[in-house]
């Protein structure tokens, strides 16, 4: 991560931290860096989610791109994975998504994609950051025919929808509830699932600029659960603001998270001989029950740090085609290069349709262990050295010995705050509380503030 670019682009409170001035500079400097790697005039696709600040930041960003001669294709409101897909398939130079994903409406973000549909290379982000920190803007200022032009490209949305539909099965006879989070999926999910012949009901489909992720979507699935519970819906599908993640709800109203979704799709692909190296890539936060289910099915797993960025990096490096996070980011590399909530939903319903099983039957093959996570404020200079403290290392070793393989402890520092995160999983809530509380007490005594 750099000074401006985090693991998911540049983010902040819109018009306060992520200002139009910064958006203009990101467009201008980002466009210039791209132009240095392109023999011809670069063509950049730009999209946004439904936040009220989206058009403000889009206007500034596009102005910056145009000022260095970039040809801009404006996609309007579109899911983040839609940008990734279109950049790659339409041979654009790059893509930019204006979104803060599952964050509330006051936040926004700007994320760049390279021409291959993946996040912009770290080296290029570093070049942009160097220009942002320069005392003077000495970049060329073309005029007349040297300026960039804007092309409105609303047909990009329909191309993305057709792609999604092409990956699925006919869902005739399936009654599906959808929560579009008042976000980007509000513009596509209904059409996609109608094209798949599903019988659908959609909530969270009335964005007003301020209600994105507000009591709806993958981080607030309660409304969807209540809709599905006691009805004849066979599944509920909850997306987040930019539709790059999915949380599902089974026919009984129970949550089916990213771990269970990866297991269901992974097992299906494995049985078809289509799971690359018979391996799923996941993070250290995936539940122990998920790991045990994979072991039972003889499916391998590769573990990364928290963040879909690290999952994608490992998938690219080692040639895996399925990975993701408990939070609902699922990357199916056979189809797209980033987490795609609607694509994941289509693959999940395809498994249901082809196996004839209910979602609860498929999901209950994974027994999720009770999990507890606590955040402990610690001395900032010690958060990365906690395991070097003898008393902390000893208590963790003691707790792991007591678990005897039937539980898991994870202690990791926050990347942005003076926090140590202590997580445990075990067969019962009582055991989880015991393990976490015991470790937390020692951490607070030794390095707490």
From Swiss-Prot:
Binds 1 Mg(2+) ion per subunit. GO terms for molecular function: magnesium ion binding; phosphoglucosamine mutase activity; phosphomannomutase activity. Its EC number is 5.4.2.10. Disulfide bonds: none annotated. Pfam families: PGM_PMM_I, PGM_PMM_II, PGM_PMM_III, PGM_PMM_IV. CDD domains: GlmM. Gene3D superfamilies: Alpha-D-Glucose-1,6-Bisphosphate, subunit A, domain 3 (3.40.120.10), Alpha-D-phosphohexomutase, C-terminal domain (3.30.310.50). GO terms for cellular component: cytosol. The keyword Repeat does not apply. Activated by phosphorylation. Its cofactor is Mg(2+). GO terms for biological process: carbohydrate metabolic process; peptidoglycan biosynthetic process; UDP-N-acetylglucosamine biosynthetic process. InterPro entries: A-D-PHexomutase_a/b/a-I, A-D-PHexomutase_a/b/a-I/II/III, A-D-PHexomutase_a/b/a-II, A-D-PHexomutase_a/b/a-III, A-D-PHexomutase_C, A-D-PHexomutase_C_sf, A-D-PHexomutase_CS, Alpha-D-phosphohexomutase_SF. PANTHER family: PHOSPHOGLUCOMUTASE (ALPHA-D-GLUCOSE-1,6-BISPHOSPHATE-DEPENDENT), PHOSPHOHEXOSE MUTASE. Catalyzes the conversion of glucosamine-6-phosphate to glucosamine-1-phosphate. This is Phosphoglucosamine mutase.
């Amino acid at each position: 991560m750099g000074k401006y670019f985090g693991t998911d682009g540049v983010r902040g409170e819109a018009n306060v931290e992520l200002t139009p001035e910064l958006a203009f500079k990101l467009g201008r400097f980002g466009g210039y860096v791209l132009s240095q790697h392109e023999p011809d005039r670069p063509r950049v696709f730009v999209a946004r989610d439904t936040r009220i600040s989206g058009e403000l930041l889009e206007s500034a960003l596009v102005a910056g791109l145009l000022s260095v001669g970039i040809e801009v294709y404006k996609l309007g409101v579109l899911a983040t994975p839609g940008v990734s897909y279109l950049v790659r398939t339409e041979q654009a130079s790059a893509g930019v998504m204006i979104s803060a994903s599952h964050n509330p409406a006051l936040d926004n973000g700007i994320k760049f994609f390279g021409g291959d549909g993946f996040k912009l290379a770290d080296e290029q982000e570093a070049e942009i950051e160097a220009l942002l920190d320069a005392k003077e803007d000495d970049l060329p200022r073309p005029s007349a025919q040297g300026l960039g032009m804007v092309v409105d490209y609303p047909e990009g949305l329909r191309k993305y929808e057709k792609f999604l539909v092409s990956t699925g099965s006919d869902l005739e006879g399936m009654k599906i509830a959808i929560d579009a989070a008042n976000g980007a999926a509000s513009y596509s999910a209904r059409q996609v699932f109608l094209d798949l012949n599903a019988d659908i009901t959609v909530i969270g489909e009335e964005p007003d600029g301020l209600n994105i992720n507000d009591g709806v979507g993958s981080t607030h699935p309660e409304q969807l659960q209540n809709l599905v519970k006691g009805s004849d819906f066979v599944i509920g599908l909850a997306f987040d603001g930019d539709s790059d993640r999915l949380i599902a709800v089974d026919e009984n109203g129970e949550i089916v998270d990213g771990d269970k979704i990866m297991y269901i799709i992974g097992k299906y692909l494995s049985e078809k001989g289509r799971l690359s190296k018979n391996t799923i890539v996941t993070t250290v936060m995936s539940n122990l029950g998920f790991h045990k289910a994979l072991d039972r099915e003889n499916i391998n797993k590769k573990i990364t740090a928290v963040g879909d960025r690290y999952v994608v990096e490992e998938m690219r490096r080692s040639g895996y085609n399925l990975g993701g996070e408990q939070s609902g980011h699922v990357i199916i590399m056979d189809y797209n290069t980033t987490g795609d909530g609607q694509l994941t939903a289509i693959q999940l319903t395809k498994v249901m349709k082809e196996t004839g099983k209910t979602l609860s039957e498929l999901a209950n093959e994974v027994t999720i262990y009770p999990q507890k996570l606590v955040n402990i404020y610690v001395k900032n200079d010690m958060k990365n050295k906690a395991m070097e403290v003898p008393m902390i290392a000893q208590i963790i070793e003691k707790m792991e010995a007591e678990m005897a393989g039937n539980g898991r402890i994870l202690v990791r520092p926050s990347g942005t705050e003076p926090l140590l995160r202590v997580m445990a999983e075990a067969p019962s809530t009582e055991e989880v509380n015991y393990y976490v509380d015991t470790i937390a007490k020692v951490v607070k005594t030794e390095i707490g503030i």
